[in-house]
Amino acid sequence: MRPQTDADDPAAETGSTTESDPESARGSAVISIDGLTKRYGDVTANDGVTFDVGAGEIFGYLGPNGAGKTTTIRLLLGLIKPTAGTATVLGADVRDRRALTEVKSDVGYLPDTLGFEDRLTGRQALDYFARMRGDERREELLELFRPPLDKRIETYSSGNRRMLGIVQAFMHDPQLAILDEPTSGLDPLKQDRMHAFLEAERDAGKTIFFSSHVLSEVQRVCDRVGIIRDGELVALEDIDDLLERGGKDVRVELAESVDEDAFVTSEMIDVESVEGTVRFTYTGEAGALLEHLVRFEVVDVEIGDPQLDDIFKHYYGDEREPLPGDG
Amino acid sequence: MTAVLRLESRKRVRGSVILLVVFALLSALYFSMFPGIQAEMDAFEEAFPEYMFDLFGIEALHTIEGFVAAELYAFFWSLLLAIYFAYVGAGLIAGDVQDRRMDLTLSNPVSRESVVLQKVAALWVPVVALNVGVPIVVYVAALAIGESFDPVALAMVHLLSIPYLLVCAGIGLVLSVFVDHVRIARGTALVLVFLLWLVDGVSRLDPDYEWIGDLAPSRYYDETAILVHEEYAFGDAGILLAAFLVLVAVSVVIFTRRDI
């Protein structure tokens, strides 16, 4: 048994995958976005977004609500037209409707708002999509995600709707899955199942483009992350690098108040202390933190992921300029 | 690729069945009334000012053909059914866009042109259901009260109404690709179809202004001329059909170019 820790990111192990599909080497771009811009009057929903998503990776598209994630996704699917710039999906230019329509048989899409025909049962809805793009993996998926297929969709809970959405997005075994907030509405157990499923898909050579506003989720499954804020890509990097810079949110409850100068180290930033409880963001090594803490009389410790907003604040400043290193 | 057509056809079944039942009940009502009031129809025709009849295109009320043309076809078919088609047409695209169903539909390898055309093609359900069901009901009901009804004229009043109903659906469809909110699209479509019908009727009252009604689709479908005079205006039906095709083409062009 290997030690199971919070930081044991499964993404780290996939370099030496023994999966059967050797052609799925990472690198060739499945999605290539180049200066993609969408304006609605004065509002710029996407502003010169540029990055690539390589074959066989799980790419996390991270940003607060309203940052422009869904706009990018809808541009990629050709639902809306770019004001400037362009993108290719599986080699098809998003401005070329005909080419884009053709590659859609190899694309799975899970929208943030799932607009099903509510009068249909789950099974009828899947039959409908199957007629357009096949369903060779339907049964396999229905063993993992089990929406009540014989009930009308109008009676579904949001979790069941999401599961039906997941099944329709993957049942035709697409090369590329574009998922907009794929786990919202799912209970934690199903979220774990979804994450494990996405990792297995990635290991089988599929490409996953995955938007989320939850850092921990992106952190768990994604190999690489792009962060979007106010329509602009503000960071593009490997998840490990991001987390290294993101640090950890720590809350320590001490038996008695200690001298702050003795307790605080240079790796702690944004320290707030109220009576015996100290909160801070820790940017150093986890081991060093624990070694430091045992010197004090600790009642309780919580170490969690930092909030996305904190990452922005600490590492990207409040400036709206894209960072160097954006593709 | 007929998945959209199949789904849309299925969605049209319920409304078509309800309308068929409504028309069957209306027919039963009017046919049961006819023998009792046939004799009084002459008096009825004298009692009302002539423009009332001109407005609805009514004549020969004492004949079964004239009576049915006036009671069933002049109002319920030419106006209410036309409004129904406009309403359905207006919901075809706007409803799906508003509820984000279109996002999922278009994530399939299906073009926007194909989606519009399949949705329009699904109108075959109400077109066939009503234009087969209602004439059978009317014909049988006429026999049941001991009248005979010219089957050719009856078939024509339905056949020639199809382009008319399709134009009304086409008006709705153009609004449907243009307007984002399905309620606005539907409301506008049914008001527009009603106004066009009214313009046709009112402009007929004064020969100097009759040309205004040339823009109204109902000008090209005259149920009384078909049933009473057995005049079958195939040319007018052709104009309606052409107008319908233009409306569909305009809708496709708008829909393929817009953001959804």
Report the location of each language-model feature.
Chain A
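ABC-family P-loop ATPase nucleotide-binding domain
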Residues: 1-37, 318-327
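Short, charged/small-residue-rich alpha-helical element at the C-terminal edge
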Residues: 248-319
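ABC transporter nucleotide-binding domain
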Residues: 195-280
